[in-house]
Amino acid sequence: VPYTALPFATAISIQHQVPLILRRKEKKEYGTKKMVEGIFHPGQTCLIVEDVVTTGSSVAETALSLQEEGLLVQDAVVLVNRGQGAERALSQKNIRLHSVLTLPYILQELLSEKLITQQIADETKAFIQTHQSP
């Protein structure tokens, strides 16, 4: 997903010795002029890597771009899932979302370390519940 998760995706690529491809935000007028950059072949499976998801729309847009190039997209991994409906939205597009951390978990850890108050944790949870994606 352009471009915030690039360091995370690069680390995964290096650690697991798998190719890295990148979806651009917009097509450049120079170079390859492609939206999807990297070495790949139609029919290959691709894992989407994202830093934070809220609604899942960025992951869905990336999946569509990759599918248009002939790649198979079944899974996405995210560093932080805010818990606002991305998992549900992506499952409707047959994409499994795997979260390293969830916002409720982060809140609980911050609370247990006394880095936030119960009031802040409760207000944040209430905000998440009232601001779910459709």
Feature-to-residue mapping (PLM):
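Generic alpha-helix detector with strongest preference for long hydrophobic helices that associate
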Residues: 1, 27-30, 43, 47, ...
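Short glycine-rich phosphate-binding loop at a beta-alpha junction
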Residues: 1-4, 77
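Generic hydrophobic segment detector
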Residues: 4, 9, 19, 57-70, ...
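A generic "binding-loop/recognition-motif" signal
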Residues: 4-5, 26, 83
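Short, glycine/charge-rich flexible loops or terminal/linker lids adjacent to PRPP-binding catalytic cores
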Residues: 8-47, 55-61
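PRPP-dependent phosphoribosyltransferase catalytic core
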Residues: 64-134
